[in-house]
Curated annotation (Swiss-Prot):
It comes from Arabidopsis thaliana (Mouse-ear cress). This is Fasciclin-like arabinogalactan protein 12. GO terms for biological process: plant-type secondary cell wall biogenesis. It is found in: Cell membrane. A lipid is attached at residue 220 (GPI-anchor amidated aspartate). PANTHER family: FASCICLIN-LIKE ARABINOGALACTAN PROTEIN (PTHR32077), FASCICLIN-LIKE ARABINOGALACTAN PROTEIN 12 (PTHR32077:SF59). Keywords: Cell membrane, Glycoprotein, GPI-anchor, Lipoprotein, Membrane, Proteoglycan, Signal. Residues 186-219 are annotated as: Disordered. Its main location: membrane.
Amino acid sequence: MEHSLIILLFTVLLLLTTTPGILSQPSPAVAPAPPGPTNVTKILEKAGQFTVFIRLLKSTGVANQLYGQLNNSDNGITIFAPSDSSFTGLKAGTLNSLTDEQQVELIQFHVIPSYVSSSNFQTISNPLRTQAGDSADGHFPLNVTTSGNTVNITSGVTNTTVSGNVYSDGQLAVYQVDKVLLPQQVFDPRPPAPAPAPSVSKSKKKKDDSDSSSDDSPADASFALRNVGSVCDAVSFCVMSVMLAWFYL
């Protein structure tokens, strides 16, 4: 009996000494939830003062394009977001005068299909290619220059500056601009180049020269025959004169 009591006490002591160690072990860390998909319009809504730009992003379908690009590929995107005050600076009726296609081009002109950090502006190559398309002069050129900490942007129609960094995560960069970027293709289209004058082919010119020569040949032959006839008449007259003179003598 005494022996059993000793074993029981020993077991209780063993449990008391090992339990705190078990209880003190940290529970496994819970993995953080993956970040939600990047949504440009939500970022702009959170920043405020981009109501008109958000409305145009949605109405043109560009917002859905950006959502798909950011969440289904590794390609970065840079957006120059004009504030609401930028749109109030436009001439009255400017947006309403645009066709649906031109509105899409206008919004796409504010999107660069690559990530551009603030430090990259100093070394970036001009003209920048936007999602609006051809960056050649007269179409959708966009040029960026820096002067100290100031980033200047020109489209050939609009000159403005970057006034703030709205958002940046290594894949998406959003910068606020002071004016709406107006592309040349929409707001200052160049007249089409005149068609070159039709050139006369060498073969046709040679044929024309040949025809001209052929036309002159009969005239030259006729002139020669007339000259021969005149000479013959003169000779005949002389012969007749000599014969008459000899006859009377």
